[in-house]
Amino acid sequence: MKGYQPETYGERIADVYDELFADVSDVAANVSFLDALAPRRPGRFLELAVGTGRLAIPLAALGHDVTGIDVSASMLAALSAADTDRRVTTVHGDMVDVLPAGPFDVVFVAFNSLFMLADADRQRACFAAVATVLAPGGSFVVEAFVPWDPPRGGPHVELRSMTTDRVVLAADLTDSVNQTVNGQFIELVDGQPVRLRPYVLRWSRPAELDAWAAATGLRLGERFADVRRAPFTDDSPFHVSVYRGA
């Protein structure tokens, strides 16, 4: 998408992110899943693409040492506003090139955020970067959707929300060959200019992630269909993969 930069998504969506994705997952279940991975208390956690702190803040409230990194200053500002007790340490930067010093007991990237890295090379590099800051025997958790099979192609539009004076649409164009989606959240509010919130993602199949992990010395420890540890099957639309450090 012309003009799109790594920080574009967060900068354009931070003000409505929590509203748009309020029901995307069970926060309590996510936090419980992550909490159980800590080998000690408090554990040391790093969240990649921490966003508004949806998971980082309640995880830190359990007493863990939590650091979150995000390329969007606006996302981190929203996190700071919500983190009234200042429990989460934040880092402004890319989740490949500027990871804070480890070792971390658990590194995690939730809600498809790994796919916000523009291409396979950047996603592969993310695994390599995580391997350098993960404690021996630590966990790297990737939560993401399982790509469509067969891949969905072409344009797609769906209604996200509607009130008497506001409509939010999601429009995207999928390239099944390059495994990319270019899209916009389109906000129409009566009497106001149209707001566009663009996003670009490159999806990866679980087998690709497993290969990148193995190449960096990580191994797949467990894979579930969700954070409640439902069994992962060929029909699962999502996966929660736990990679272990050497």
Where does each model-flagged region fall?
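Residues lining the SAM
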Residues: A110-N112
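SAM-dependent methyltransferase
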Residues: V141-A211
